[in-house]
Amino acid sequence: MSRKSKKIKKKVFKDSKYDSQVIAKFVNRMMYDGKKSISEAIVYNSIDLLAEKTEEVDKVAAFSKALDNVKPLVEVRSRRVGGATYQVPVEVREERREALAMKWIIAAARKASGKSMQEKLGNELVNSYNSTGVAFKKREDTHRMAEANRAFTHYRW
């Protein structure tokens, strides 16, 4: 029996503009030093850019599609068995899928050079919507790693 107590999940409130919990989480993940208003402005402007470039009417649906295209289905985890460490492919829980997708999109946008953060994030969201870009490549690499190590699936825990 585990001695560690379970982590209590924080309730994330819906964001004010789109009334979406997912966008609120994204805003929180974008935030630096508690500056939420700046983070909100960046995210909202980049969602507007996404809707404009993809000609999608529903902005929340466009954002959700961009996020869904980056969500990984499987990932590899290290498992030590008798002195050897194996990369064991495991299915990813829905909450972690969402968190990883957000993390990868934001990291890709921050890594891009030039332009404002709104433009960089907007472009990365457009790329994710179209199943291209750095964040989507990260997802594909993760899936490729899991596929390569499929032989070790029996080591799941």
Swiss-Prot record:
Keywords, ordered alphabetically: Ribonucleoprotein, Ribosomal protein, RNA-binding, rRNA-binding, tRNA-binding
InterPro entries: Ribosomal_uS7, Ribosomal_uS7_bac/org-type, Ribosomal_uS7_CS, Ribosomal_uS7_dom, Ribosomal_uS7_dom_sf
GO biological process terms on file: translation
Recorded GO MF terms: rRNA binding; structural constituent of ribosome; tRNA binding
Bridged cysteine pairs (disulfide): none
Keyword rRNA-binding recorded: yes
Pfam families according to UniProt: Ribosomal_S7
GO cellular component, one term: small ribosomal subunit
UniProt keyword annotation of rRNA-binding present: yes
Source taxon at top rank: Bacteria
Quaternary structure (record): Part of the 30S ribosomal subunit. Contacts proteins S9 and S11.
Similarity comment text for this entry: Belongs to the universal ribosomal protein uS7 family.
Function: One of the primary rRNA binding proteins, it binds directly to 16S rRNA where it nucleates assembly of the head domain of the 30S subunit. Is located at the subunit interface close to the decoding center, probably blocks exit of the E-site tRNA.
NCBIfam families attached to this UniProt entry: rpsG_bact
Protein name, entry field: Small ribosomal subunit protein uS7
Naturally occurring in which organism (per UniProt): Borrelia turicatae (strain 91E135)
Gene: rpsG
